Amino acid sequence: MNPQHDRRQYVSMTPCTYSVLLLCLGLLAFPTAFPGPAISADVYFSPDGGIRQHLVRTIQQSRQHIDVAVYQITSTELASALVTAKDRGVRIRILTDQENLQSSGPALRILRTSGVAIRSLGIVEQRLMHNKFAVFDDRVVATGSYNWTQSAERANYENLVLLDDSEVVTRFQREFNRLWRQAEPW
């Protein structure tokens, strides 16, 4: 090998090395690009990840209100947990898609006969109410791909995230209230 060739190659890499070094030092000086507190999140998966049991526990811990916006509800276990919460004095509101009401199964009948407020979207603008979230006591949001159905728990690959960030909760509550005002009572 030619010693001058090696030297030139080393010299040509030096500015690149310095740039990388400065970049690393800059990142150490400013550890986060997103100031503010970190958001706490619990993440669950199905099948076999226990999403339903985590939702039931969150329902049981609620004391004031639960607002649920889901495309479909067929889980009688979740419906029963909501009715039990209602019997404890927790205000329950369910927002679902019109199509879900037309094929209402036992879960929706349990909720309806127990006096839970249920409204549907999809009539006015022919859009699906395809949200999947719930707000618990203005303190926790549950959101993800998980419909409140038997198949979501046992057969589908689904996810659910529980978030307790007040700004995130407020935004979801605001969206629920907006949709609730547009929805038709059942």
What are these regions (language model features)?
Residues 19-31:
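Bacterial N-terminal signal peptides
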Residues 35-41:
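Boundary at the C-terminal end of the N-terminal hydrophobic targeting segment
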Residues 136, 140-186:
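Signature of lipid phosphatidyltransferase scaffolds
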Residues 57-117:
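Primarily the HKD phosphodiesterase
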Residues 6-22:
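Bacterial N-terminal signal peptides that target proteins for export
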Residues 42-47, 68-71, 118-120:
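Short, flexible loop segments at the rims of nucleotide/cofactor-binding pockets, characterized by
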Residues 72-76, 98-102, 124-128, 140-141, ...:
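Solvent-exposed loop/turn segments at secondary-structure junctions
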Residues 67-70, 93-96, 120, 134-135, ...:
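Structural recognition of the beta-strand scaffold that forms the well-ordered cores
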